[in-house]
């Protein structure tokens, strides 16, 4: 198996092995003692904090408030909505004993919070004046995972989950799309992932939802990653949990509810969208370190070390997250390789000769620029623009890859070929049994009906029945 000098499997040889090696070697994550759990290390958690901060700001700017609800949920709550409990039953972790005694009612460890939040909404809502109720929670959830993969599928993960209640369907559906728009913006503008927003087919909907919307990203192996979802729940949960209000006309009515979430799975998406055989490649807007400075000294050069610290101070003063790697026991070459592995967008190399010339060597993590000698004095003012250009470069690179691996197909042979390396855009009948047959034959599933897709009708690519949805569906193998 091909490996580079860092001991990392090449993406082209085994993408799954590359991913597993990179997230560990780059210091993002470690395995937890319990099967399927992960420890997010400080470098990985800083990435999550940056994503969390930006997402939280957008959630609050649109009128939502953060709250926190219990981790343990009475088992009977899940049974109130039949589709919901059926969808989550295989993944549930249940507490049955406490202090050596059997509980009268088992407690489910939170897989998601529609039920417990629905119970509280019923207490808090009585009038149309109480609506809309716009809540968000940052929490951990547990869904027992038989085939774990760090960040992508783990037994416990971190996320935010929004839950809202509204007077009617129209306002709830607007909320559903607002959340999807937030996720689309975060993925595209911050993570530089050119996701496709769309609606899930009935067979792929969230358990208990009337409609599920998603953003789907293409990873560098051609597979899809569901990166955030938003659900219109109709009155199903309101009926199950008696979430009612008195309307302006004095009638008692059921609320329309929504739920939506984005998780630490996005970290895996960033790794798989931008990484290469050297390791991670972080988009600057979410990089824990946007710039790393490597002073090149032998035996300690006070002038060089001082200049590196001063440059770092000036970069930080203009908002650039900067780290100085002054570890004396490591060679510059080792540091270069390490920071390439860890995905830092820009490396600055500063030695005695550079200091004499008033320059520093700038190396971008990707691109054809190579090493560039740039003036130290003007670098802090120029660096935000350099980082913006790198961010745009990553988005353009990922978009070109996605578009080059997504094919419009009209027959089964082309469909099977397309999903072996990427996505197929095909007409489909919408019949669940046909979806299942496609999955069994190719491992591909309908990822979404793109919101921006052009109107089109015809016959199903598999069974030949009349097409549904009025447009093409994206099919692909997925994480």
Swiss-Prot record:
Q: Which GO terms describe its cellular component?
A: aminoacyl-tRNA synthetase multienzyme complex; cytoplasm
What PROSITE patterns does the annotation carry?
AA_TRNA_LIGASE_II (PS50862)
Keywords for this entry?
Answer: Aminoacyl-tRNA synthetase, ATP-binding, Cytoplasm, Ligase, Nucleotide-binding, Protein biosynthesis
Listed GO biological process terms: prolyl-tRNA aminoacylation
Query: Which enzyme class, named as a word?
Result: ligase
Q: Which reaction does it catalyse?
A: tRNA(Pro) + L-proline + ATP = L-prolyl-tRNA(Pro) + AMP + diphosphate
**Classification via InterPro entries:** aa-tRNA-synt_IIb, aa-tRNA-synth_II, aa-tRNA-synth_II/BPL/LPL, Anticodon-bd, Anticodon-bd_dom_sf, Pro-tRNA-ligase_IIa, Pro-tRNA-ligase_IIa_arc-type, Pro-tRNA_ligase_II_C
* Record comment regarding domains: Consists of three domains: the N-terminal catalytic domain, the anticodon-binding domain and the C-terminal extension.
- What is the protein named? Proline--tRNA ligase 2
Q: Origin organism of this chain?
A: Rhodococcus jostii (strain RHA1)
């Amino acid at each position: 198996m091909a490996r580079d000098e860092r001991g990392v499997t090449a993406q082209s040889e085994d993408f799954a092995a590359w991913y597993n090696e990179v997230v560990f070697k780059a210091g993002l994550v470690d395995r937890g003692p319990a099967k399927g759990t992960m420890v997010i290390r400080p470098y990985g958690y800083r990435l999550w904090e940056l994503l969390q901060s930006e997402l939280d700001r957008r959630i609050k700017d649109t009128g939502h408030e953060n709250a926190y609800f219990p981790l343990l949920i009475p088992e009977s709550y899940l049974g109130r909505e039949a589709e919901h409990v059926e969808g989550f039953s295989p993944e549930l972790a249940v507490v049955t004993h406490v202090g050596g005694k059997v509980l009268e009612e088992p407690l489910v460890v939170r897989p998601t919070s529609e039920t417990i939040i629905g119970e509280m909404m019923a207490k808090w809502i009585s009038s149309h004046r109480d609506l809309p109720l716009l809540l968000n929670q940052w929490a951990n959830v547990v869904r027992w995972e038989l085939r774990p993969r760090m960040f992508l599928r783990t037994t416990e993960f971190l996320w935010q989950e929004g839950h809202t209640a509204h007077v009617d369907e129209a306002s709830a559906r607007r909320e559903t799309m607002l959340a999807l728009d937030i996720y689309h913006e975060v993925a595209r503008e911050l993570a530089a992932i050119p996701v496709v927003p769309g609606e899930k087919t009935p067979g792929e909907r969230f358990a208990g939802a009337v409609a599920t919307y998603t953003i789907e990203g293409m990873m560098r192996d051609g597979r899809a990653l569901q990166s955030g979802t938003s659900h219109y729940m109709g009155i199903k949960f309101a009926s199950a949990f008696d979430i009612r209000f008195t309307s302006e006309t004095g009638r008692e009515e059921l609320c329309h509810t929504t739920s939506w979430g984005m998780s630490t799975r996005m970290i895996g998406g960033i790794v798989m969208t931008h990484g290469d055989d050297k390791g991670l490649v972080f988009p600057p807007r979410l990089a824990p370190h946007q710039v790393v400075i490597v002073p090149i000294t032998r035996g300690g050069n006070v002038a060089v070390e001082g200049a590196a610290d001063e440059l770092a101070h000036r970069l930080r003063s203009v908002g650039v997250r900067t780290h100085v790697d002054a570890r004396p026991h490591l060679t510059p070459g080792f540091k270069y390789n390490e920071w390439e592995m860890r995905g830092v967008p820009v490396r600055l190399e500063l030695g005695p000769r550079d200091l004499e010339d008033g320059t520093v060597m700038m190396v971008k993590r990707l691109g054809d620029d190579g090493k560039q000698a740039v003036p130290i004095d003007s670098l802090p003012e120029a660096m935000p623009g350099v980082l913006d250009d790198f961010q745009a470069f990553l988005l353009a690179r990922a978009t070109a890859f996605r578009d080059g691996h997504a094919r419009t197909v009209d027959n089964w042979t082309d469909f099977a070929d397309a999903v072996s390396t990427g996505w197929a855009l095909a007409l489909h009948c919408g019949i669940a049994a046909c979806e299942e047959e496609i999955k069994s034959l190719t491992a591909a599933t309908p990822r979404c009906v793109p919101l921006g897709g052009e109107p089109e009708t015809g016959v199903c690519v598999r069974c030949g029945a009349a097409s549904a949805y009025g447009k093409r569906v994206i099919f692909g193998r997925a994480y």
